[in-house]
UniProtKB/Swiss-Prot annotation:
Protein name: Protein C4
Superkingdom, natural source: Viruses
GO biological process: symbiont-mediated suppression of host innate immune response
InterPro entries listed in its UniProt record: Gemini_C4 (IPR002488)
Stretches assigned to coiled coil: none
Family designation: Belongs to the geminiviridae protein AC4/C4 family.
Keywords linked to the UniProt accession: Host cell membrane, Host membrane, Host-virus interaction, Inhibition of host innate immune response by virus, Lipoprotein, Membrane, Myristate, Suppressor of RNA silencing, Viral immunoevasion
Lipid attachment site numbers (N-myristoyl glycine): 2
Membrane topology note: Lipid-anchor
Region: Disordered, residue numbers: 77-96
Length: 96
């Protein structure tokens, strides 16, 4: 049974009912370099606008290892984070 990688993409906007989803499965070649990029939207009630965080992980698959071992290695790799946008403090409304 050959190794394969599955990927699922999702994109949604808070103000619309439109969602874009996609998925892909492929079989990488031995020693192929793969870069995984993820973008996560961070939301907090105190934030006036959402903040996005980008993480990137690069890896080279080694087929003699089991997929479980490879996934464990990926989860242990360090990720790089883009600087967070400055968050302005939100003043609470004055009580009436």
């Amino acid at each position: 049974m050959g190794n394969h990688i599955s990927m699922c993409l999702s994109n949604s906007k808070a103000n619309t009912n439109v969602r874009t989803n996609g998925s892909s499965t492929w079989y990488p070649q031995t020693g192929q370099h793969i870069s995984i990029r993820t973008f996560r939207q961070l939301r907090a009630q105190q934030m006036s606008r959402p903040t996005w965080r980008k993480t990137e992980t690069s890896l080279i698959l080694e087929f003699p290892k089991s997929m479980a071992d490879q996934l464990e290695e990926v989860s242990n790799l360090p990720t790089t984070h883009m600087p967070k946008h400055s968050i302005q403090a939100v003043n609470p409304r004055p009580s009436i």
